[in-house]
């Protein structure tokens, strides 16, 4: 073993996994944080649509950066949530299994919150697709204006 070996091993040992209770709290806190983040994302996507309609390039660039940073943070929480669920339940955990670990009242609250989160995710996906479709259409129109039609007549 090299001189760095024992030090590295000690550093790994000091980075213990959270307890089961801490893992559950981290998981629940991550869901709550994502609820707020998806509300923010929805607002940003609405702003992005308006900026695209108005052809506001600078605003689109700023919004793209804000969306990207928000999505990165949400992805980090998703990864952490999966790791916490794996710690609590073992490989291939499901949220239904996580719910089952809780007492009835907190379970009902978490299930409701999870359903709301899923709805926010779906709405943000819908808004993201709408924005993407608009931007692609605008790009296509600009290409036609700048470069003309590739083919005026369709073959019979």
Feature roles, as predicted:
Residues 2-97:
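Extended, charge-rich alpha-helical scaffolding segments
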């Amino acid at each position: 073993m090299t001189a760095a070996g024992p030090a590295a091993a000690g550093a790994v040992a000091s980075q213990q996994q959270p307890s089961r209770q801490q893992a559950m709290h981290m998981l629940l806190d991550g869901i709550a944080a994502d609820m707020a983040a998806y509300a923010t994302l929805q607002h940003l996507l609405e702003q992005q649509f308006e900026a695209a309609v108005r052809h506001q390039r600078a605003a689109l660039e700023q919004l793209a950066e804000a969306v990207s940073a928000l999505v990165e943070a949400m992805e980090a929480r998703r990864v952490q949530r999966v790791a916490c669920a794996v710690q609590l339940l073992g490989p291939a955990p499901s949220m239904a299994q996580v719910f089952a670990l809780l007492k009835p009242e907190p379970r009902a609250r978490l299930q409701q919150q999870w359903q709301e989160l899923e709805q926010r995710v779906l709405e943000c996906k819908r808004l993201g697709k709408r924005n993407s479709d608009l931007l692609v259409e605008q790009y296509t129109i600009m290409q036609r204006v700048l470069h003309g039609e590739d083919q005026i007549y369709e073959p019979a």
